[in-house]
Amino acid sequence: MIDQLKIIGQYLLPKKLLSRLLGKLAAAEAGKLTTFLIKKFINKFNVDMSEAKYSDPEYFKTFNDFFTRELKPEARQIIAGEDNLAHPVDGAVSQMGDIKEGRLFQAKGHDFSLRELLGGRDDVAAPFDKGLFSTIYLAPKDYHRIHMPITGKLEQMIFIPGDLFSVNPLTAQNVPNLFARNERAVAIFSTAVGPVAMVLVGATIVASIETVWAGTLTANADKEIQYWDYKNQDITLEKGAEMGRFKLGSTVVALFPKESIHFAENLQAGSVTRLGELFASKVEHK
């Protein structure tokens, strides 16, 4: 009954207004209030500040500065080897596996469309049909920068306005098409395993999604899907390099072509992921 009420609340809640208001608060330089909120957040979610480059809550001028905090250089090691892909984030695997008949598994009784996830264009979705996916949830305590699993040249980006449902196991099990209806940014790279898509999915209280090449992404006045073509620009990011960040967090969906990679043997739904550790290996074709 409580779970049902929570889901009903998700539909009734003014999610975009709430996200805008909290986004403004998170961006405000509010002095002692900012420090107070950061300390409360650290205690509530058991955030490990020993890994942060700056561990003193008073160092951060805004809550966003704290939330997107940088790690110490030695805090994460990126797995070596050209054929090894690295975990792009700290988080936990929500679901992973094969893309079957153009659909990705969300939770028991729910799947969603690859085409819709990527903005509705067949040419964008086609390279990933019958491919593989991994959906990784970033909890409040996690490090909220997203890094490259493999060296890649940026080919295109798509920003898709949408809803801002909370993303967690409860909503995944009860909100149809959750990841294909929430606001999201899609970045597609050419890599040694073929095209790789990194989908950054927004959620309630996610004030913004940023990329290192375009900055903060926002919906235009008409709430239309926006496209950027980078094929003629040399924007190449090395494995382990930062590619984006959430100002307040959500989920990353990584997409790969058919027979391009094998996920790490110990990886499954529920697995904790740690930036830089083995995510997958390239399939060698004879």
UniProtKB/Swiss-Prot annotation:
It is a peripheral membrane protein. It comes from the Bacteria. It is found in: Cell membrane. The record marks 249-250 as: Cleavage (non-hydrolytic). It catalyses: a 1,2-diacyl-sn-glycero-3-phospho-L-serine + H(+) = a 1,2-diacyl-sn-glycero-3-phosphoethanolamine + CO2. It is an enzyme of class 4 (lyase). Transmembrane segments: none annotated. Its main location: membrane. InterPro entries: PS_Dcarbxylase, PSD-B, PSD_type1_pro. GO terms for cellular component: plasma membrane. One of its GO terms (biological process) is phosphatidylethanolamine biosynthetic process. Pathway: Phospholipid metabolism; phosphatidylethanolamine biosynthesis; phosphatidylethanolamine from CDP-diacylglycerol: step 2/2. One of its GO terms (molecular function) is phosphatidylserine decarboxylase activity. Binds 1 pyruvoyl group covalently per subunit. Keywords: Cell membrane, Decarboxylase, Lipid biosynthesis, Lipid metabolism, Lyase, Membrane, Phospholipid biosynthesis, Phospholipid metabolism, Pyruvate, Zymogen. Its EC number is 4.1.1.65. Is synthesized initially as an inactive proenzyme. Formation of the active enzyme involves a self-maturation process in which the active site pyruvoyl group is generated from an internal serine residue via an autocatalytic post-translational modification. Two non-identical subunits are generated from the proenzyme in this reaction, and the pyruvate is formed at the N-terminus of the alpha chain, which is derived from the carboxyl end of the proenzyme. The active site is at 90 (charge relay system), 147 (charge relay system), 250 (charge relay system), 250 (schiff-base intermediate with substrate). The modification Pyruvic acid (Ser) is found at residue 250. It holds the Pfam family PS_Dcarbxylase. Its cofactor is pyruvate. Heterodimer of a large membrane-associated beta subunit and a small pyruvoyl-containing alpha subunit. NCBIfam families: PS_decarb. Belongs to the phosphatidylserine decarboxylase family. PSD-B subfamily. Prokaryotic type I sub-subfamily. Catalyzes the formation of phosphatidylethanolamine (PtdEtn) from phosphatidylserine (PtdSer). This is Phosphatidylserine decarboxylase proenzyme. It comes from Psychromonas ingrahamii (strain DSM 17664 / CCUG 51855 / 37). The gene is psd.
